[in-house]
Design a protein with these regions (language model features):
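C-terminal structured interaction module
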Residues: 151, 155-188
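Short, surface-exposed secondary-structure boundary micro-motifs
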Residues: 38, 44-45, 169-170
Length: 188
């Protein structure tokens, strides 16, 4: 599951007390997730990742992760990891609540389109026309979720688990060698 957002009505004071009392779970939403689910985590939305998840998290480059609560986890040295309580409390939007799993409509391919980025999902089959991504539109991150494909422009072979940073000046022509699912992130 993923922990995303505060429940409606949770105030800064209530959340601070829950942190002191180790009762954070009562203040947050826990979403059961399955492969392919998408949740847009807006800036200021408290979130955490439960064990057993492999996620794609798109975020601004930063040397800091504000850890407000650590769910009883410890670091590799066996000691509790550093928390950033005050910084976290300052950055959490306490008026933001009730996030939801993004609904993926058959035939639709845009998972999120916000001011920071756009992410689209594509499913390609062998024999389909190549997916054409024009040069000069945006730099792109291409994430291969399943299958195998070739960038006909560069000759690069891409398979499940590969991530490919495509420069602004470079286009791509992606052809499936086997059924493939990929995410393309741009406009960042």
């Amino acid at each position: 599951s993923l922990i995303v957002g505060l429940k409606q009505g949770v105030t800064r004071e209530q959340f601070t007390q829950a942190l002191k009392d180790s009762k954070v779970a009562a203040c947050v939403h826990r979403f059961p997730v399955k492969p392919g689910d998408s949740i847009l985590v807006e800036s200021g939305r408290m979130h955490a990742i439960d064990a057993g998840n492999l996620i794609l998290e798109i975020q601004q480059n930063s040397d800091t992760t504000y850890r407000v609560y650590d769910w009883g986890r410890v670091g590799l040295d066996g000691a509790p990891r550093q928390l950033h309580l005050e910084e976290s409390l300052q950055s959490i939007d306490f008026d933001d609540y009730e996030p939801e799993t993004l609904k993926i409509v058959p035939g639709a391919q845009t998972l999120a389109d916000c001011k920071e980025f756009r992410i689209r999902k594509f499913e390609l089959e062998p024999g389909d026309d190549p997916l054409e991504l024009a040069a000069g539109e945006s730099a792109r991150l291409i994430h291969i979720l399943s299958g195998a494909l070739t960038d006909l422009t560069s000759g690069l072979g891409l398979t499940k688990g590969n991530n490919y940073l495509q420069a602004y000046v470079t286009g791509a022509s992606l052809r499936a060698k086997e059924p493939a699912t990929l995410l393309v992130t741009d406009r960042f």
